[in-house]
Amino acid sequence: MPTKNQLIRHGREEKQRTDRTRASDQCPQKQGVCLRVSTRTPKKPNSALRKIAKVRLSNRHDIFAHIPGEGHNSQEHSIVLVRGGRVKDSPGVKSHRIRGVKDLLGIPDRRKGRSKYGAERPKSK
């Protein structure tokens, strides 16, 4: 426990906060190149095959990004746009890929939540 005099002379050192957005450099989106596309099983008690991709961002950071929605046309060397947002049951996956931008196509025939999946507006009858 420091004395008052020691605190006046030196003060207290502030704790360094860990940066949650280290890979994105404080940017809302970042462009990257797909290195590998694979599936991963989630933590307990969930069960699925989550589609993920290893992406090298334009600032040379390698990250894992989740591919949302049903089905995708993603493969190695495709150019993608990545946003933040973790997948709670997949450790190490802290970002999402944006559908309907660059090489990752939107979901065809999707009617609800279209903006999240890059889907076109359906033709009215």
Swiss-Prot record:
Spans annotated as Disordered: 1-29, 105-125
GO biological process: one example: translation
Stored Pfam families: Ribosom_S12_S23 (PF00164)
CDD domains: Ribosomal_S12 (cd03368)
UniProt keyword Kinase present: no
Subcellular location: Mitochondrion
GO molecular function: structural constituent of ribosome
HAMAP family named in the record: Ribosomal_uS12_B
Protein's name according to its UniProt entry: Small ribosomal subunit protein uS12m
Species of provenance: Oryza sativa subsp. japonica (Rice)
